[in-house]
Amino acid sequence: MKKVLSVASEAVPLIKTGGLADVVGALPAALAGQGWQMRVLIPAYRGVLAQLGKVKQVWGDPDLFGGPARVVLGKCGGVEVMALDAPHLYDRAGGPYSGPDGDFWDNAERFAALSWAAAAIARDGAGGWQPDVVHAHDWQAALAPAYLRYWGVQIPTVLTIHNMAF
């Protein structure tokens, strides 16, 4: 069975601002019937961990882009979800990209960290699981294939741009 790490900034039903979340949330079930095992990696925004219920840590970095981070594994709606828990980057009021005062000033750094974690998981594995393919969704995950290439990791990658307007 091929294993795919699907990396995105949002996924239904955990966090949604648009159609990206719908696709990322539906893809694992759609591909499971074709023999693919998928895990979704998203940031652990405020409230995401509570929706995952019981989780276990599968990866960690004591200094990911300026603070400690861990990836935890849980389930939501039958989908295995990995959440990047880095409070210094994601535990904020508002949505995934903006707060009460507008866009977060460090969005580029926040999503570069998500891509870094995805690439590290693809390179080293996480909790005994290592993907055969990394599927990056939109600009927020687009650096994952670049990090893998820079590190010389020979793993297939896919980058899907869901809406060119963003």
Enumerate the language-model features and the residues they cover.
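Catalytic cores of nucleotide-sugar-dependent glycosyltransferases that transfer UDP/GDP/TDP-activated
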Residues: 1-166
